A protein has these predicted regions:
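Transmembrane alpha-helical segments that form core, pore/gating elements
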Residues: 44, 52, 67, 160-219, ...
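Structural signature of hydrophobic alpha-helical transmembrane segments
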Residues: 51-63, 102-120, 162-175, 220-235, ...
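Hydrophobic transmembrane alpha-helices of multi-pass small-molecule transport proteins
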Residues: 139-156, 279-298
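C-terminal transmembrane-helix exit sites in multi-pass transporters
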Residues: 120-142, 262-281
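Hydrophobic/small/kink-forming positions within alpha-helical transmembrane segments
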Residues: 33-41, 68, 91-99, 121-126, ...
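Loop-to-transmembrane-helix transition segments
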Residues: 24-32, 71, 76-100, 164-172, ...
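Transmembrane alpha-helices of multi-pass small-molecule transport proteins
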Residues: 2-12, 24-25, 49-96, 175-178, ...
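Helix-helix packing/entry segments at the starts of transmembrane helices
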Residues: 114-119, 186-202, 238-269
Length: 312
């Protein structure tokens, strides 16, 4: 989300990565988060002169170009799927979450929006429990509850501290979480490249529909330069995150995603002069701490299940 804090598709990481690969995976993930924060900053800058939908569409071009190259190399077999409806649904959710986030950051400081977007993993945990019937222990439920408290501290609803558009980030997080749940279904049946292709094609198609009604020709200058740079940066960020999960365990590199808040704060200050206030930092610290703890508990539970399976 910010625009996306996870890869565009479910990727099954190496089962037994070498120690050096774990370090490389962390480096890839850190690089991806650095670029994602840069892309979010570019998007916020562009919304000052262009319609948010046009900005999201322009960002999508990088991923779409990559898919066209993939289709040229491997042919239409890339689009072979066992569940087209779910693939289309996932593409729609991806477009929705990205659009809502970009609209939100046109009003809300980048660091605040990124902090709130990290509520998505907690929503994924809840959906996993209620939709996928995944067992969730009491400690993870407590972590989820505390994480939501942290989100409320950042937003402070009814106090007029943050622009109401921050609620769009919450809706974007819900869309993102739903997308991740769909990804879990698709991971067992479709290839990663298939999911990436459908996400890019469906998302681009949806975002193109309103384009004739909101299109604005950018004036020559910084806006054009940023438009040209944003799409390749977004595509490279996606690639780095995917490579990270290919060469290392997801549980090793996932906490690095929270560095997005650091980069978002840095860019927000350097470009827009925005700095989070004291309570935003407190809320963000709570969200990140409980998020990392949730990842730790998932790792413990996964190891326990593997041990039980091997003993059986």
């Amino acid at each position: 989300m910010g625009v996306s804090i996870e890869p565009a598709s479910p990727v099954i990481p190496s089962k037994d990565p070498r120690p050096l690969q774990s370090g490389l995976g962390i480096a890839y993930m850190a690089g991806g988060m650095f670029l994602f924060a840069a892309v979010d900053t570019m998007a916020k800058f562009l919304t000052e002169t262009l319609h948010p939908l046009q900005v999201v569409w322009s960002r999508q071009l990088g991923l779409l170009l990559g898919v066209f190259i993939l289709l040229a190399i491997k042919g239409t077999s890339v689009l072979a799927t066992k569940n087209k409806k779910l693939q289309i649904t996932r593409g729609g959710l991806a477009a929705c979450s990205a659009t809502l986030f970009i609209v939100a950051v046109s009003y809300v400081p980048l660091a605040d929006a990124v902090a709130v977007s990290f509520v998505a993993p907690f929503i994924v945990t809840m959906l996993g429990a209620f939709v996928l019937r995944e067992p969730v222990g009491i400690r993870r439920w407590i972590a989820v509850t505390i994480g939501f408290v942290g989100t409320l501290i950042v937003i402070r609803p009814g106090m007029g501290v943050i622009h109401p558009a921050v609620m769009l980030v919450l809706v974007a997080a819900i869309c993102f979480a739903l997308r991740q749940v769909v990804s879990r279904y698709l991971a067992g049946s479709d290839r990663t490249e298939t999911t990436v292709a459908y996400t890019a094609l469906v998302g681009s198609f949806i975002l193109t529909i309103p384009l004739p009604f909101i299109w604005q020709w950018p004036t020559p200058g910084p806006v054009v330069v940023v438009l040209l740079v944003m799409a390749p940066c977004a595509a490279l960020a996606e690639l780095l995150v995917i490579k990270s999960l290919e060469v290392s365990q997801a549980v090793v590199v996932a906490p690095v995603q929270y560095s997005l808040l650091i980069w978002g704060t840095m860019y927000g200050y350097l470009v827009f002069g925005h700095l989070p206030d004291f309570w935003t930092w407190i809320g963000a610290l709570i969200i990140v701490s409980t998020g990392v703890y949730t990842l730790h508990r998932e790792r413990v539970v996964t190891r326990r299940r593997k041990a039980e399976t091997q003993d059986a």
